[in-house]
Amino acid sequence: MGIIARQTIKGTIATYIGVAIGFVTTFFILTKYLTAEEVGLTRVLVDAATLFSSLALMGTGSSTLRFYPHFKDDSRNQQGLYFWTLIIPFVGFLIFLICFFAFKGLIVRAFQDNSPLFVNYVYYALPIAFFVLYMSVFEANATILERVAVPRMIREVFIRTGLLVGYLLYGLWHVIDLDGLVMVLCATYGLGALLNLCYLLFSQKISFKPDFSKITPELRRDFLWYTLFLITAALVGSVMPTLSSFFISAKMGLMFTGIYAIANYIATMVEIPFRSLNAIVQPRIAVALRTSPPDISAATRLYQQVSTNQLLAGMVILILIWINIDLFFDLLPNGEQYAAGKWVVLILAISKLATTAFGVGGSSLSYTRWYYTSLFFTLILVVLSICLNNYLIPICGIEGGAWATLASLVIYYILLLSFVWWRVGTHPFSWVQLKVLAIGLLMLGLNYLIVLAVGKLVHEPSMLFRICEAIARTLIVSVVGLLIVYYGKVSPHVNELIRKGLRMVK
């Protein structure tokens, strides 16, 4: 087995372990031992730090990979490349610090009325941002060395475990106060960055010794233009996922941010299939679009297959979440409070479904000569999201933040996919997707009939009965949906997976 395969397997295992830790932490520790306001505080601090670090990074991660062939040689310092990966983000962080203190008054005024707790702890976002920044830098360096498993383990397992310990020390064992919890957050990310650095140094394959011999005027110009593009892309790309959290914190308070954060975590499950499949399919789309002439037919066929499969997988996950959402909140610690985010779950899950079904389109644009236009569409997305969040949250509350996200994405994908169809000639739509949506409606209809029948037979069910009924109902709805997909020949890939599964059972 090659090094890439081994590293991929180890990284995947680390990711799934991290998901399990994150699930337990979010749904059984945070909701039980922290108030919604405290959950909101930890969420906004990390969101702010992530945003700050993305800007300070100045595109170093992508630039390192792009310009690595120019520096590559047999030396440990790759002719000064690793040195620049330390210096450029540090300069970016200094620039960010100047901007932060210049606009500190605006930040305080925006949050002081409804989220004074965030104002009290906003300075802690700075060290967290610094540590997250260099975690990203060291991970990029490890990627060059083709050693991604340990950095992935540090990010997915160590960081999540450290945060879990902090939450338990604060909420369950009462060893530390809120100040101590925030310091544990800082220390956890700091140790994560330090462990990444130690791993690189102990590998004895890297050196941060400076070397200016490869910095030509042409390289400097190319690097500056590419970095400018990446900074702008990072700005819009990092702002978008955190906009609603910031607006809700500023206009409603951290308690509502905590409720929104839990709802968003539930909705994020719809995206899980997209994350893995998107990384696999991108090289194949790139090959189709980079041939001379581009194989538009192959790219379109692949695009439609991926969109259909993603729509099917995401829709099934969304339905299974939604038909059990009331029971989930009843089982969740302090679920009566977090149930206020029920409709946020549905709205955000639909927006995640749109991303899973059509997100490949934006990525495929990167492999054409119109790659730079993706930045323009992303800017439109962010501006729409800012305007809609500002307008809808005061009217609709946390649901307004979810509606703002969904509406922004719908408009964004209409514009983006229209442009891709016009310029590239590919599109994700096929009649099979109408079958997928019809199957989803049938599954929801079947669930409704079962709930109606059970409700007539049992008027005041116990919690144990509700759990058993939910398990049985979920199995029935899933099996019926799977049979319709199989015999309706909706997706050859899904049918092949089903046949493989049946052969394994036999």
Tell where the protein language model's regions lie, with residue ranges.
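Membrane-proximal transmembrane or re-entrant/amphipathic helices at the cytosolic face
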Residues: 449-506
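Interfacial segments at transmembrane-helix termini and the short loops linking adjacent helices
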Residues: 104-125, 321-352, 459-464
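Membrane-interface junctions at transmembrane-helix termini in multi-pass inner-membrane proteins
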Residues: 5, 131-155, 349-380, 391, ...
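Hydrophobic alpha-helical transmembrane segments
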Residues: 154-169, 173-204, 379-384, 390, ...
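Signature of the first transmembrane helix
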Residues: 3-63, 93-101, 128, 225-255, ...
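Helix-loop junctions and terminal segments of transmembrane helices
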Residues: 27, 57-73, 144, 263, ...
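Interhelical loop/hinge segments that connect adjacent transmembrane helices in multipass membrane
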Residues: 1-4, 174-184, 196-241, 284-301, ...
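N-terminal membrane topogenesis motif
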Residues: 1-24, 45, 76, 200, ...
